[in-house]
C-alpha cells in the first residue's frame, strides 16, 4: 500500500447486513460521526429496501437504545444488495455483518470485490470464523486491507472491540483500527490472533456450552439458571439464557460448531458439542 490511512478518511461506511447486530453497528457508527449505507437482501414482495428499513426500525425500538439521540438516524440510508451494492465504491470502510456461514460470507465478498475501490478498508464482524478463510481467494489489495472487527452486542454499550488480522493484513490497517476503535468508536480495542472464536467467544461460548450440558445433566430450569448466573454471582442481569437471546442462539451454535470442528484435540472439545434441546430450539 502506498497511501497512509488516516482516521479522518472514515466519512462513509457500508454495513452489509441489517440484522440485530448490523443495525446496531450502523446506529453506533452514525452517532460517532459517519454517514452509513445499510444494505441487506432485497424483499421478495413489496419495496425492495423493506428488510433493511424494517430491521433499522426494530433496532430503534429496542432496549437499551442503540442511539443516544434519534436525530442520528438521519445519517443512515437503507438499501439492498441488488440495487445498491455498487455504492460501496463511495465508502471508506465496508463492514460485513451477515449470517455466520463461511460459504455465504465468501459469496458476498466475491460480489463486493467487483465494486470495492482499491485501498478501501474492509472488515468482518464474524464471531469466530477464521479471517484467513474469509479472505481466501480474494485479491492481494483486498487481503491487505481486510481484518476482523468484532463488536459485541449491544455495540453502543459494550466496550470490547476485537481486531483480528489475517495473514496478509497490512500493519497500518491493524494500527488504524486499534486507534480508531478507541479514539472514535469509544472502544477498548484488543488485538487477537486468528484462532477459532478469537478470545472472548472462545472463553464465553465455552462457559455457556459447559452450562448447557450441566443444565441437561441436572435437569435445571431456565428460570433457575438465570437467577443463579446473573447479579447473584456478579454477572449482568441478562444472566445466561437471556444473554443467548440477545446474542442470537443461532450465532452461538455456529461459533460452538466452529470451535468443535477446528479444535478437535482441545481437552474440553466435548463441551462445544450442542445439546439436543439447544439444537431443537435452533431448528
Task: Map each language-model feature to its residues.
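N-terminal glycine-rich phosphate-binding loop for ADP-containing cofactors
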Residues: 1-283
